Amino acid sequence: MGDVMLRLFTEEDHKHKGKLVYEWLLETGRELGIPGGSAFRALAGYGHHGRMHEDTFFELAGKLPVEVMFAARADQVDALLATIAAEGLHLFYIRTPAETGMTGA
């Protein structure tokens, strides 16, 4: 069983069960035993719809992409993706094999 890098994408103002989606993802990952996760807010981006979202457009406040990233065992990522699907969330994701380690170890 190898390690996996999972990257999920949402918008900064999207909510699920009253929480921001990226917060819900991080909390759910922690509850499933994933050792760490991070959320990153984009400076600009576009998705399947093709509309550009940039920090400079006032009318797009809250619409910037957020990436939530986890490095975990494959079974942990499988459990997270199954939980996301069971909750009815529709998120684009990228799953890739990963080699993990610690420097100086």
Residue positions per predicted region:
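Positively charged, small/polar-rich N-terminal and surface patches that mediate targeting and assembly
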Residues: 1-105
